[in-house]
A protein has these predicted regions:
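Non-heme Fe(II)/2-oxoglutarate
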Residues: 2-104
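Short beta-strand segments enriched in hydrophobic/aromatic residues
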Residues: 22, 34, 145-146, 207-209
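Short catalytic/ligand-binding loop motif for oxyanion handling, primarily in non-cytosolic enzymes
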Residues: 25-27, 114, 127-130, 183-185, ...
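Proline-centered turn/helix-capping motifs that create local helix->coil transitions or kinks
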Residues: 39, 107-111, 149-151
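A short glycine-rich, His/Asp/Glu-containing loop-to-beta-strand
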Residues: 109-122
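Conserved short histidine dyad/triad with adjacent acidic residue
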Residues: 119-135
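Catalytic core of Fe(II)/2-oxoglutarate
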Residues: 137, 147-211
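Eukaryotic charged/polar low-complexity linker/IDR segments
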Residues: 140-142
Length: 211
């Protein structure tokens, strides 16, 4: 893996931010799949993708539900068919997980992560995610994408308890513990059809260690 520079923070909670995370070839593969999903009837509402209905009006897909078939004793794994589920293995590189583990004792098990699930989420005009905690998940990784020139405002990742905010810079990724309360500020965009893809994309990975 190419050299990446990470910004590590302990306050107001442990988190790791890496800018320009994916290279050009990886971005091409990611955008190929994002464009495929940004069509009528493909992105689902919260009640259908496992989101918190009272907290968000954004649309998403749980990719693992599409590319893994749980029938019988042995699940059939088609994750390699997905560009995103293939390329985002980069987020679980040993060096990155060790860096996250070293931030604070509450993150020490990140280096032992052996399980993850991934959602693709799209925010267009008027869409948001109210503050919540992913308490069933040990760790989170959010990577952001949008077409340039950028047409929307808002979409920042914010943490009301800490009066803290992180911008959704294009091709950046943030790692943090699942217990941290977080939300997404409302996206505002003018002169843009929902399906032209000029909103805010987030690839959300939920990961940790299971037996």
């Amino acid at each position: 893996m190419e050299n990446l520079e990470a910004d590590a923070f302990i306050d107001p909670f442990p988190h790791l931010i890496i800018k320009n995370f994916y290279n050009d070839d990886e971005l091409e593969l990611i955008w190929e799949e994002l464009k495929f999903y940004t069509k009528p009837g493909k992105l689902l509402t919260a009640k259908d993708f496992g989101g918190v209905v009272k907290k968000t009006n954004s649309h998403a897909l749980l990719l693992d539900a599409i590319y893994t078939i749980h029938t019988g004793k042995n699940p059939v794994n088609y994750r390699k068919v997905s560009n995103i589920l293939t390329v985002n293995r980069k987020a679980f590189d040993k060096s990155i997980l060790e860096a996250l583990s070293s931030l604070h004792e509450c993150c020490v098990h990140a280096k032992d992560a052996n399980h993850d699930v991934t959602k693709v989420r799209y925010y267009h005009n008027g869409e948001y995610y109210k503050p919540h905690r992913d308490t069933l998940q040990q760790f989170l990784a959010f990577s952001y994408f949008y077409k340039e020139p950028k047409k929307f405002e808002g979409g920042e990742l914010y943490f009301p308890i800490y009066d803290y905010e992180v911008p959704c810079d294009n091709n950046s990724i943030i790692f943090l513990p699942g217990w941290v309360e977080h939300g997404v500020r409302e996206v505002k965009i003018k002169d843009s059809d929902y399906y032209d893809g000029y909103g805010r994309y987030c690839i959300s990975s939920f990961f940790g260690q299971i037996e």
